[in-house]
């Protein structure tokens, strides 16, 4: 637990140095690589499997904490572009989108389990357990890739743009 705390304490410094978008993108790429390696190796030792997932989800933890700071950057960018600060509206849209994503992923999980033939009667069949393993590696890897690509190609707030927005708002508010 202390080790994880130390990792996350460094996150703020890394985000300041490289940028939030950049750090979030890299954390998703590293998580993808870890998931793919786990899928390819198919570890038979449960602790090796757990190790891969702990490492991948430390990366997810980076993203999940950075995203909250990125919301503030979006609010600042909106204020620079529109001249009004819309904290509540932007946060509400983000919160709603997050809830939609969580609902979708919950439904997807059930659908994937059905697709591999999971039921109470087949829970320990080798084909089903291998299917669960495959889903547990492939589904997160696909999600991490989708997030990394979205951040890289769609999310416009690079470190430089965020710094420009901060300067513009400082100048605007000091008048």
For each of these PLM feature ranges, what is it?
Residues 155-175:
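Intrinsic disorder in cytosolic terminal tails and internal cytosolic loops
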Residues 78-94:
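Loop-to-transmembrane helix entry/capping segments in MFS-fold secondary transporters
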Residues 30-44:
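C-terminal ends and interior cores of transmembrane alpha-helices
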């Amino acid at each position: 637990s202390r080790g994880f705390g130390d990792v996350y304490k460094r996150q703020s410094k890394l985000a300041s140095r490289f940028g939030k978008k950049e750090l979030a993108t890299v954390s998703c790429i590293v998580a993808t690589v870890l998931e793919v390696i786990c899928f390819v190796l198919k570890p038979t030792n449960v602790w090796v499997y757990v190790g891969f997932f702990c490492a991948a989800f430390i990366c997810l933890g980076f993203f999940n904490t950075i995203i909250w700071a990125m919301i503030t950057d979006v609010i600042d960018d909106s204020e620079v572009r529109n001249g009004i600060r819309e904290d509540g509206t932007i946060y509400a849209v983000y919160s709603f989108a997050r809830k939609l994503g969580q609902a979708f992923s919950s439904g997807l999980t059930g659908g994937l389990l059905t697709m591999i033939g999971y039921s109470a009667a087949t829970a320990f069949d080798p084909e089903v357990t291998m299917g669960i393993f495959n889903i547990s590696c492939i589904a997160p890897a696909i999600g991490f890739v989708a997030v990394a690509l979205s951040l890289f190609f769609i999310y416009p707030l690079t470190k430089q743009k965020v710094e420009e927005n901060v300067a513009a708002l400082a100048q605007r508010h000091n008048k």
